[in-house]
Amino acid sequence: MNFEKFTTKLQEALNEAQSLAVAKDNAYIEPVHLLYALVKQQDGAIAPLFTTLNVSTQTLINELELILNQLPQVTGTTTQASQQLIRLLNQTAKLAQQFNDSFISSELFLLAALDDHGSLGKLFKAFGLTKENVTQAISQMRGGESVNNQNAEQTRQALQKYTIDLTERAKTGKLDPVIGRDEEIRRTVQVLQRRTKNNPVLIGEPGVGKTAIVEGLAQRIVNGEVPEGLKNKRVLSLDMGALIAGAKYRGEFEERLKAVLNELAKEEGQVILFIDEIHTMVGAGKTDGAMDAGNLLKPSLARGELHCVGATTLDEYRQYIEKDAALERRFQKVLVDEPSVEDTIAILRGLKERYEIHHHVQITDPAIVAAATLSHRYISDRQLPDKAIDLIDEAASSLRMEIDSKPEPLDKLERRIIQLKLERQALQKEKDEASRQRLAKLDEEMTAKAQEYSALEEVWKAEKSALLGTQHLKTELENARIAMDQAKRADNFEKMSELQYGTIPALEKQLQDAIKREEENNDHHLLRTKVTEEEIAEVLSKATGIPITKMMEGEKEKLLRMEQVLHSRVIGQNEAVEAVANAILRSRAGLADPNKPIGSFLFLGPTGVGKTELSKTLANFLFDDENAIVRIDMSEFMEKHSVSRLVGAPPGYVGYEQGGYLTEAVRRRPYSVVLLDEVEKAHPDVFNILLQVLDDGRLTDGQGRTVDFRNTVVIMTSNLGAHLIQENAEITYLAMKEMVMSVVSQHFRPEFINRIDETVVFHPLDQQHIRAIANIQLQRLIRRLAERGYQVTISDTALDHISQAGFDSLFGARPLKRAIQQELENPLAQQILSGKLLPNNPVIIDYQDNHIIAKQ
């Protein structure tokens, strides 16, 4: 017998049957071995055939295993095919000729095995299999095709293997409801109704709901809410992963796709094929000289044999499909825009129930409104409704996590009880009177805590069971509604009326009663079961770092103390501190323009007066981290070409993928202080890109992405006009500001200066300011020494000397650091290393005989 004439699947099954016979020490490979291998085979033809014949494959496998275990076992012999198996295979070859097959397939072996006179024949009789019903099932499975290649079995029932039936999922209620999008669905239906080129392609940004539109179409078809031409059609989604997975050899992928297209052609327009991410079809399966999937689709699309709905993003459509003009002309574009905030709220209200059932929590309407509005305002790089749905989902998930875990009061009590038990064990070993008294007190506390714990646990369990009861009713009600829809479609009026007038009203009443009871006993002091706008804001704050949550009393107090905190570190610059503090207060009170940065400032003044220090102090105040500052030294951007480093190199240049210094930093940390240091040293062209940041709070980077600057504080520092400030230190602040601004307006363009919220001129520092700064810096030194065990106090005379030594009206506070190093740190370091100063002893630093001394 020529084994080359067997299909691939039958050859694999024969090899498997031989392995099985060897494993079970059987001398011969019997027909039962082969049938067992065929039934267990993945993607084989036999298992689906038995399903068609209403025979349980699991029952059949169990029966076959019983027969296999009864076969005689022999050791030390070579396994060979039995006469009975050879006879059946010959019979199968004859049947293949009768069916006009070029290759011998697995299902014909089943037909031949019906003539078996042994245990297999008896088994088939027990299952009620006859030649007539098996032949009929084979014809149904083959769909009128003969076996003309070795892989014929793999390409059968291609639609079942490589597609997902969306209409079936809509019937069983597995698809989420689709709210709105009527215009897009109507346009899609309009294109599908055409005679030729009836293939719409949905194009839109990621997350706007392209796939949801097709799901909405499937739901409308199921409910009969479509024109006559689309009624009773099926919407199948092509599973590209299943189509490509396991296609090892050249041509196998094309074979599978061709099988799908052939089956679709046989359906004669009764199937609408949905290809999500349709751009993946262009180039899919393309190897040297092979056709890609896109070219295989073209003839079917042009002839109208294939009703296809595609979905892809704008960028990918341009990149892949527009390049192939022949493929593009076969599709009709349907643009899917981002829904408005109002439409998003409607969509979320429709989805609310599904998410409530999944997470077992209640989602309030203010939470839905907050999710739509806050995500629209604060998440700029993604689209509605996807980003709003994500917020609802995550907020509900975090609440569900809290419900499932032990509440904090219970957890604290449990830990305290464990702590008391450990203490009790230790005290039991002691015999003295004090320990006994302590033990008695401990027992009293333990009893009280245990009672408190059990009472709280009862409350928690009662709350949890009430919550689970409500959720169970919601799930039952949802299932009853799905069952009613199915009964309506099947014209089962008896079941429909039973559900509509009996089951559903009863469940609704039970649910209302349960919710009413919950509200009456509304003392949920352990479990939070409602998603409110606060939970939404909390999730968004964690994701973006922008403080959106309602301000707690502590934060309000902190903000009102803001000027005081800034003054404690930035000395002698009242106007600057006030301007910055007011900008932050306006923003957190919700009064600032939402389309501009929180504040944009130009700090002018001589070197070393606190311009950069104020920026650092602000970052430290807002984020408790001095490094939460995007600092860019503008002296690095002196050449014209270096401007691109801020926003990223243009396409075609090295470093295009890396993004810009400024844009990438703000994308990663949208709520931050942006410090552009020494701004006058940058090339004038740099200020052109800052115009849109200061005006609209946005900047487009080299890759075309819009970066949101609306939650940043933009601070620019400059030394322009510093000489005027030094020379005219005695005149009024306003007069000095006017003089400095005349110099600034000569250097910067009017449109740049006009966009800055406030230009702040810093005063030169006098002796008193330097003394206060010296005190701050010396306190830092004292803290560093305290960490090493030295308790240091500095006398007023020493402080006066250091502040005088570090005072220079031209250079501000910077010489002070050098003075502290030379006058104090250097001699201190020598004395510590030489052992003259010992830790854990008080150290007094004083000024005597024209130099600073440290004594213990």
Curated annotation (Swiss-Prot):
Subcellular location(s): the record lists: Cytoplasm
Say which domain of life the source belongs to.
Bacteria
Coiled-coil parts of chain: 389-523
Q: Does the keyword Cytoplasm apply?
A: yes
Q: Region Repeat 1: which residues?
A: 6-71
InterPro entries of this UniProt entry?
Answer: AAA+_ATPase, ATPase_AAA_core, Chaperonin_ClpB, Clp_ATPase_C, Clp_N_dom_sf, Clp_R_dom, ClpA/B, ClpA/B_CS1
Which region ranges are annotated with the description Linker? 339-545
Q: Give the molecular function GO annotations.
A: ATP binding; ATP hydrolysis activity
Q: A Pfam family in this protein?
A: AAA
Which positions does UniProt annotate for ATP 1 binding?
Answer: G204, E205, P206, G207, V208, G209, K210, T211
Provide the family line: Belongs to the ClpA/ClpB family.
Entry function: Part of a stress-induced multi-chaperone system, it is involved in the recovery of the cell from heat-induced damage, in cooperation with DnaK, DnaJ and GrpE. Acts before DnaK, in the processing of protein aggregates. Protein binding stimulates the ATPase activity; ATP hydrolysis unfolds the denatured protein aggregates, which probably helps expose new hydrophobic binding sites on the surface of ClpB-bound aggregates, contributing to the solubilization and refolding of denatured protein aggregates by DnaK.
Can you say what this protein is called?
Chaperone protein ClpB
Q: Which gene encodes it?
A: clpB
